Amino acid sequence: MSVLFFDIGATLADVSVAADGSMTFDPRPRVVEVLDSFAQVRKGIISNPGPGATARENAAAALEAAFGGRFADEALVHWGAKDSRAIFDGAVTSAGTESDDCVFVGEDPDERAFAREAGMRTAAHPVFTLAAVEGRPVHWARIEVPEDRNLAELEAVANLDEVVPVHVASDRLVLAMATARGVRAVEQSGFTADLRGQVEETSAFLVRDDRPVSVPEAFAQAPAVSRATAEATMRAAAAFAFVSAELAESRPTASSLGPAPGGVYIAAAAGLPVENVHIPGTRPGHIERLLPDPALLSRPGQARAEGFVAAFAPGAPSQETVDAVRAAVTPSAIRAHVARISGADPLVEGDPLTVRSRDASSADNERVVDALAGRFQELGLAVRRHAFTWRGHRLSNVEAELAVGASDGVVLVTAHLDSTGAEGEFFDSAGRPRPYDPVVDPAPGADDDGSGTAAVMATAECLSSMVASGRSPARSVRFVLFNAEEQGLVGSKAYARAAAATGDDIAGVLQMDMIAGFRGGTRTMEIHAGSVVPGPVAGGSDALADLVAQAGAAVAPDFTVQQLTGAADPAVGRSDHASFHERGWAAVAVSENFFDDTRPATGTRQYHRPGDTLLDIDHDTDYAASVARTVAVAALTLAGL
């Protein structure tokens, strides 16, 4: 009989770590029913809670609290790193059976690859555990929704069978993982499915390609739908050809899963660095890592987004709030935070250590997380870390909340804490060009997104000061700093997925991504509300953008505010707000004048380069403070202050 081993983070549960190190495991959707369907089968754990006995004890306590009694055999519980086959070999030995009788269930493709090396069968999601036991393959599938069907009907079918969505391209197309059994259920319900390659040890990415496409003259007189299909097919082929050429020396390689919104879906084998590929002529943020999530079909935030529109009442923010923000969110405050996390000043006062890089692969990333979490704690906020794994790295998003009793939802003020220097020029000891090495190369990220992170911290300090003076918001306010944004929105996708699974009531998300770059000319800030997700999320995000624009008029009257909306917004899917759009919540991203769209860009010229420092000529903390004040006033107004 088979022995089942499960990873915890993102597979069985979403993991959060409190300030005292205690852990909470929130079971992922459909997980408990899967475990209970194998009640008579031996089950174990292969997971890495972090170094030290205390971390393992905390993880064991959280496991029992979340899944009481379902993992009773301690001999089958294995804590430790999953960066080689060693821990998987140990699991097979503990099972006392053949390796082929052992199944490892884990979302991370690299870990599944190590499990395969140890002779284990694997499943990319708990829903496919039985398929792994029975030796049935799981495929990538493009599911088409006909005009007489909708996503809610597809969800009803998928949640009862072996189907898990990873991306909703539109109301008519969903990319999913599915077995042949799941596909039969889908097709019997009136949907169609186009099977692509097997999932095995691959993960899915959306790679956008903004280069112009010339549709053949033969389509000149064709219906608009036919021309659009031809253009999408050609764009997908061009994008995949470029990615394949860039990764030609890698083994194994990637495969195309067909056209995606603005580009191509790609299945990348374990270890393949798709996120490092940059297509010339393509706007920034063109790669998304896609995660399996049943909530992509239900979009639980839609009701809240719809209510946001109905409840939104235009009006100027209170003068008291404006004054408080002006006093706390200052150029000097922004500069001080940026200096600490970009290496211009020591990270922590009294400690000479400075930050070289906040890249997700850099050792400094965790140090910055520690420092930011510590500052939030000093402000009296409830702090926890949302833990996740990316390419063998244990990473954390940082969350800090001022909770309000009987709150009508929570307002999120967000940015991403990581950085990259991938667009820089690097040379080896002989002076020959070499690729960016995220482990050792500098990535100060003063603008991207040190400026947004600084603005979040300054807003938290402002709220703390307001509360100390006797004011209290009507809604809870939560500050979230996402990790691994530069790897395809990985941290925010993991966070938003967890929020959807736990029924988080999010009133609105205000993301700041690059707010300090200014070359001169007209002071302009961009408010990005656009999304390809249809339904209430579009209206809710537009209304949230209106609120930000009104705040800008109050605290940054010398700025031109550029509101971008709809599918034509150049930031669609390219910053962390998109992870919330996917699940139906109203969200905006506010930035410097970064995109060349209706007016020439005046933002930083050091994007993703080691020159993105506090001393860069384009880095303007006065400019950043004005944008930060705008978002702070909007957020605090939404919170009822």
Regions found by a protein language model. Name each.
Residues 2-18:
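Asp-based phosphoryl-transfer active-site loop
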Residues 18-45, 53-57, 85-89:
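Short, acidic loop-to-helix structural element flanking the phosphoryl-transfer center
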Residues 48-102:
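Substrate-recognition "cap/lid" segment bordering the active-site pocket of phosphatases
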Residues 297-362:
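N-terminal hydrophobic or amphipathic helices/low-complexity stretches enriched
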Residues 336, 343-403, 560-562:
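A non-catalytic alpha/beta surface segment that caps or lines the substrate-entry region
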Residues 337-351, 375, 379, 396-480, ...:
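Catalytic-core environment of secreted peptidases
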Residues 484-587:
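Metal-dependent peptidase/peptidase-like ectodomains
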Residues 511-534, 567-641:
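Active-site-adjacent mobile loop/cap segments within catalytic or ligand-binding domains
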